[in-house]
UniProtKB/Swiss-Prot annotation:
Full protein name: Uncharacterized protein MJ1618
Organism name: Methanocaldococcus jannaschii (strain ATCC 43067 / DSM 2661 / JAL-1 / JCM 10045 / NBRC 100440) (Methanococcus jannaschii)
Domain Cupin type-2, first and last residues per copy: 45-110
PANTHER family hit by this protein: 16.7 KDA PROTEIN IN WHIE LOCUS, CUPIN 2 CONSERVED BARREL DOMAIN-CONTAINING PROTEIN
Domain of life of the native organism: Archaea
InterPro entries, per database record: Cupin_2, PKS_Associated_Protein, RmlC-like_jellyroll, RmlC_Cupin_sf
Gene3D superfamilies assigned to the protein according to its UniProt record, in alphabetical order: Jelly Rolls (2.60.120.10)
Length: 125
């Protein structure tokens, strides 16, 4: 039998912060907080009428899952609309940003591997 440590977070106890790209982030799981975790999972919120800055991550790949709202995603030279239920894969070194084009906050579940770090992120605009 394999023994494991159960990690459970409580949303209301996680303090949000503003990241380099301008989105409001809640780190749901991150190895800086929970030892043994190998990736990061965060909720990003882009307020109505706002967008993130164009940026890229040198080593991290990201997966975005749209929880709520509508957005205009820029991924390298492509632009396309996203909505609740959509999933977007973002390879390392790929310039990307997202704009809230809806009338409610755009909520995104972001999974990163290796885990998100400010040092791995370059703002491009």
């Amino acid at each position: 039998m394999i023994t494991m440590k159960i990690i459970k977070t409580e949303y209301d106890k996680i303090k949000p912060y503003i990241t380099k790209d301008g989105s409001i982030i809640r780190e749901l799981l991150h190895p800086n907080i929970y030892k043994g975790v190998k990736q990061s999972l965060a909720e990003a919120i882009v307020p109505v009428g706002s967008k993130t800055l164009l940026h890229k991550h040198y080593t991290s790949e990201e997966i975005y899952y749209i929880l709520e709202g509508r957005g205009l995603m820029t991924l390298d030279n492509e632009k396309f609309e996203v909505k609740k239920g959509d999933t977007i894969y973002i390879p390392p070194k790929t310039p990307h940003k997202i704009e809230n084009i809806g009338n409610v906050p755009l909520k995104i579940l972001c999974c990163s591997y290796p885990p998100y770090s400010h040092e791995d992120t370059e703002i491009l605009e």
